[in-house]
């Protein structure tokens, strides 16, 4: 009998106090960050990553930018510095997919491909070796496109095509009925 994998919840923030509170509940499994969130924190990115890792999380999406070579170089550097927690986050662009393939297949580094807006992008990302694909559910819903429908469609294609190494990580989830209320925090 095949048992489904347990759902994981990632917190999208660079606020280490909030991360610490939610981690203490046992409800979150990882953290995703991006340059904007890091900038809002007013801290050095690597200082934030180190603190998140020290909290105990072993899956932190650390976004890299630039052309494919720059993303590869930065991704390898981050994965070397944070070997127990780094998942390199790249955009679903031609350069991002080239970086994903290099990082994931040649360097065995976990990669989260973000900015997924359709099934074809998810398939290309999985083919490039992505650990996670991050469809922008909230942004699609904001534009009257069924974001959760996209998750279902990607999942169906991944099941039919036996894609087992790539997981779906819903991104940009902004509806209050799908987010954890801060009143749950002790």
Predicted regions and their residues:
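Single conserved hydrophobic/aromatic residue that forms the stacking wall/gate
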Residues: 177-186
């Amino acid at each position: 009998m095949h048992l489904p994998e347990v759902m994981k919840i990632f917190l999208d923030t660079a606020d280490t106090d909030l991360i610490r509170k939610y981690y203490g509940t046992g409800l979150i499994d990882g953290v995703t960050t991006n340059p904007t969130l890091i900038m809002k924190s007013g801290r050095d990115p690597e200082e934030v990553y180190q603190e998140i890792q020290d909290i105990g999380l072993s899956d932190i999406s650390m976004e890299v930018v630039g052309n494919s070579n720059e993303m590869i170089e930065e991704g390898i550097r981050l994965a070397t510095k944070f070997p127990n927690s780094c998942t390199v986050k790249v955009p679903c662009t031609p350069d991002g997919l080239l970086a994903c393939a290099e990082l994931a297949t040649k360097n065995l580094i976990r990669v989260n491909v973000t900015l997924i807006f359709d099934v074809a992008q998810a398939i290309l990302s999985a083919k490039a070796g992505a650990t996670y694909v991050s469809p922008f559910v909230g942004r699609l819903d904001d534009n009257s496109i069924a974001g959760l429908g996209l998750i279902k469609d990607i999942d169906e294609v991944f099941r039919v095509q036996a894609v087992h190494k790539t997981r779906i990580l819903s991104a940009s989830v902004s509806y209050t009925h799908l987010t954890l209320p801060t009143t749950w925090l002790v």
